[in-house]
Design a protein with these regions (language model features):
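AAA+/P-loop NTPase substrate/partner-engagement loops
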Residues: 274-304
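Walker B catalytic acidic pair
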Residues: 312-314
Length: 315
């Protein structure tokens, strides 16, 4: 065959142009980078805001991933907006973690965050129905999604409700500043990332990598203290100590003991359920995981929540 130098140069230029565009798209965000579902985010941006010379992602694959997330987390309504709100709620960065601790922040960090929020707000304004090849297609359906598993215990309804409420509020933000204020208030009230959205955790230790990961327990049995009958003195002691702890006053470590089935674990869950909204979180650590405790403390030391380390079966 004949090697066409001119065509080869054009092809290289085209590939280089595509790479530059792809790089530019990925780097337009300053703080909100490395999103939990970054590839899906990028692909949706490419579908909704196509650029010349850019390869078109598989729209059906994107729809499938968003629907999978909706089933996993129980999302309803406009799934595109829910996905964007989920990205905002989960991304731990300099701005979001600062807001979790002190609330609204000013100065350059706030200005940099507004740069990102302006772009996300623009994404909220884009109509996913434009992706439909036919009238009343899959994307139109995803704008008014009804969750078939509404009464299911397969997902955490509290987390779902917060994400859906955030998405609706952001949809109606009339300015970049209002958009930023809504997200900032969310961070201050609930926190950000896994510690903001979840109440209970366990640890996973990677012996080879010498790494300790704190993973959410997504479904915690909703037991209330009023469900525990006949333990009024014990409940009073737990309540008094827990309230002192979350208020920053002196508190003690607690040892719960008794026969199997007497309510020890139920008491722990009930305390967690009652005080979660006031910032209480709980991390379950087993006896064989004690050597990873220092790594756990290192990961939670700068968060705005109050953490109880729950050690089960100390025998």
């Amino acid at each position: 065959g004949i090697f066409d130098t001119e065509s080869a140069v054009k092809a290289c230029d085209g590939n280089r142009k595509g790479r530059i565009m792809e790089e530019k798209r990925k780097n337009t965000m300053i703080l909100y980078r490395n999103l939990r579902y970054q590839q899906l985010f990028d692909d949706m941006c490419s579908l909704l805001k196509p650029e010349e010379g850019e390869a078109r992602p598989d729209a059906y694959a994107c729809a499938s991933q968003i629907i999978d997330l909706a089933v996993t987390y129980g999302f309803r309504g406009n799934l595109w907006h829910c996905f964007l709100a989920f990205c905002m709620a989960n991304n731990e960065n300099a701005y979001s973690t600062s807001c979790e601790i002190i609330g609204p922040v000013g100065g350059s960090l706030s200005e940099l965050a507004r740069h990102d929020f302006a772009q996300v707000r623009e994404l909220f304004s884009l109509d996913i129905a434009c992706l439909d090849e036919t009238e009343n297609g899959i994307w139109s359906e995803m704008k008014h999604y009804e969750n078939a598993l509404e009464n299911s215990k397969a997902f955490n309804h509290r987390i779902r409700d917060r994400i859906v409420e955030l998405s609706v509020s952001l949809e109606h933000a009339e300015s970049d500043q209002e958009f930023q204020d809504i997200v900032t208030e969310f961070y201050k009230e609930f926190g950000v990332g896994k510690f903001g959205l979840n109440k209970a955790f366990h640890i996973i230790m990677d012996e080879e990598a010498k790494q300790v990961d704190i993973e959410p327990i997504t479904r915690v049995e909703h037991i209330e203290l009023s469900d525990l009958v006949g333990y009024e003195l014990q409940k009073a002691k737990l309540i008094e100590n827990t309230e002192a702890f979350i208020e920053g006053r002196a508190a003690n470590n607690c040892l719960l003991f008794g026969d199997s089935g007497t309510g020890k674990s139920s008491s722990i869950k009930a305390i967690l359920n009652q005080y979660y909204d006031r910032g209480l979180r709980m991390i379950e650590v087993y006896k064989h995981q004690f050597r990873g405790l220092s790594d756990v403390l290192e990961q939670i030391k700068d968060r705005n929540s109050k953490f109880i380390i729950y050690m089960d079966d100390l025998s």
